[in-house]
A protein has these predicted regions:
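Interdomain linker/hinge connecting the two RecA-like lobes of the SF2 helicase core
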Residues: 1-80, 84-96, 188-189, 194-200
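Hydrophobic residues at beta-strand termini and immediately following loops
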Residues: 35-40, 103-105, 149, 179
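Short, solvent-exposed loop/turn segments at secondary-structure junctions
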Residues: 42, 86-90, 108, 133-134, ...
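Conserved helicase ATPase core of P-loop NTP-dependent helicases/translocases
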Residues: 81-83, 91-92, 98-134
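Conserved beta-strand segments of the P-loop GTPase G domain that flank and frequently precede/overlap
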Residues: 83, 129-130, 148-150, 178-180
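Short, well-ordered beta-strand core segments
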Residues: 127, 146-147, 165
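A short beta-strand element within the Helicase C-terminal
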Residues: 138-151, 174-178
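A conserved SF2-helicase RecA2
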Residues: 153-200
Length: 200
């Protein structure tokens, strides 16, 4: 705390060119639309589950969540970034989503780089992968639609994955779908709590 108080005595923080009279063009972000879809109920169950119970809930709803993701992506001509956390989710998503390319951790580096470059160039309609593989560092302003087929407890992974498309240079509103089972409500609440802590 003392360090930050000392820093505040002489520093100025500028988070946008508008703060010092410049135009915002190029540094403005489009609208971010986040929609939650609960595949097996109307309301998330907010009770705290053990890690084992949460894993079982994800396994139990895997087919429903993947089919819902496929319904959304297959009814669109636009590019889609499909995020998952489990290998079984990845395989099922690739199976049910038309024109999808799957990038797994066990893939050869050539496949990973060719797939990510192909997605960047618009040659791949749907890229199925994990935030731990492609959630950091990629610039995909060419895409403005993504689906999370479930969530992990990591706010950082969620934030970084969304920021692959929601970044400076993005010309269209970014649509983020979060597809979860009712029993995963506590995971989403945990992410939201971490986000609120981050923004304080």
């Amino acid at each position: 705390d003392v360090f930050w108080q000392w820093l505040a005595t002489f520093s100025v923080f500028i988070d946008n060119p508008v703060n010092i009279g410049y135009k915002v063009a190029g540094y403005d972000l489009p609208q971010l639309n986040i929609q939650e879809i609960i595949v097996d109920g109307n309301e998330p169950i907010k009770e705290t589950l053990t890690l084992t119970e949460r894993r079982q809930a994800r396994k139990d709803s895997l087919t429903l969540r993947c089919e819902k993701a496929a319904e959304i992506a297959n009814n669109s001509d636009e590019q889609w970034l499909i995020w998952c956390d489990l290998n079984d989710e990845s395989a099922k998503l690739h199976e049910v989503i038309n024109d999808s390319v799957e990038v797994k951790g066990s893939d050869k580096p050539e496949h990973k780089s060719n797939s990510m470059i192909g997605f960047s160039e618009g040659k791949i309609k749907c890229l199925v992968t994990k935030p731990s593989i492609a959630g950091f560092g990629m610039n995909w302003q060419n895409c403005h639609n993504m689906i999370f087929t479930g969530l992990s407890d990591s706010y950082e992974q969620f934030y970084q994955a969304v920021r692959r498309c929601y970044r400076f240079g993005q010309k269209k509103p970014v649509n983020v779908y979060i597809i979860i089972s009712a029993k995963e409500g506590c995971v989403k609440e945990n992410i939201e709590r971490k986000q609120a802590d981050f923004l304080k």
